Amino acid sequence: MSYVPVVIEQTSRGERAYDIYSRLLKERIIFVCSTVEDHMANLIVAQLLFLEAENPKKDIYMYINSPGGVVTAGLAIYDTMQFIKPKVATLCIGQACSMGSLLLCGGEHGMRYSLPHSRIMIHQPSGGYKGQATDIEIHARETLKIKRLLNELYSKHTKQELKYIEKSMERDNFMSSEEAKKFGLVDNIISSRDTIAFLAQ
């Protein structure tokens, strides 16, 4: 089990201990920093809904360092980001690959950021199915439907032509922060908090 730091906060009622992620959640910061799968997606969705209930008019900040993962789990997070009232700013720290890159570009337009040395990767969904030929055919058709859906979502958020997206996602397509900005996955590259403060003006 990985160690999670604990923060001690002094209050008028005494000391209170938070794990570091819970403390940052108080500041409306959510971390997507692992493989995207059902359990973690449920936790991220719950945090988004909680912060909306706390204040539907205040922005949420999502920090992403993820290699990607399960498409349906990623879409659960993505759909919730679009569903809730607060704007969701996204920031890539380290990497945003596969479904991680969709979450990155699915943030509020103008509020999608990357640190200078982050890596972003897009690609088509993959499937490895076993069983009867008919079942494999069913899963293959579903994978093609998911592929079309993802291409349409990337096209929507990057403002790129669908045909260009389809070509770009045929194989693993790694990008630097600058390349991701040119592609339309992020809006700005930031190296300090001063940069964010300037862009927010």
Swiss-Prot record:
GO CC field: cytoplasm; endopeptidase Clp complex
Query: What does the entry give for GO biological process?
Result: protein quality control for misfolded or incompletely synthesized proteins
Q: Which UniProt keywords apply?
A: Cytoplasm, Hydrolase, Protease, Serine protease
The first-level EC class reads hydrolase
| Chief place of localization | cytoplasm
A single GO molecular function term of this UniProt record: serine-type endopeptidase activity
Catalytic center residues? S98 (nucleophile), H123
Q: Which Gene3D superfamilies match?
A: 2-enoyl-CoA Hydratase, Chain A, domain 1
* Compartments where located: Cytoplasm
Matches recorded under CDD domains: S14_ClpP_2 (cd07017)
Question: What is this enzyme's catalytic activity, as reactions?
Answer: Hydrolysis of proteins to small peptides in the presence of ATP and magnesium. alpha-casein is the usual test substrate. In the absence of ATP, only oligopeptides shorter than five residues are hydrolyzed (such as succinyl-Leu-Tyr-|-NHMec, and Leu-Tyr-Leu-|-Tyr-Trp, in which cleavage of the -Tyr-|-Leu- and -Tyr-|-Trp bonds also occurs)
Q: What is its EC number?
A: 3.4.21.92
Q: How does it assemble?
A: Fourteen ClpP subunits assemble into 2 heptameric rings which stack back to back to give a disk-like structure with a central cavity, resembling the structure of eukaryotic proteasomes.
**NCBIfam families for this protein:** clpP, PRK00277.1, PRK12553.1
Function noted in UniProt: Cleaves peptides in various proteins in a process that requires ATP hydrolysis. Has a chymotrypsin-like activity. Plays a major role in the degradation of misfolded proteins.
Q: Which family does it belong to?
A: Belongs to the peptidase S14 family.
Instruction: State what protein this is by name.
Output: ATP-dependent Clp protease proteolytic subunit
- The gene for this chain is clpP
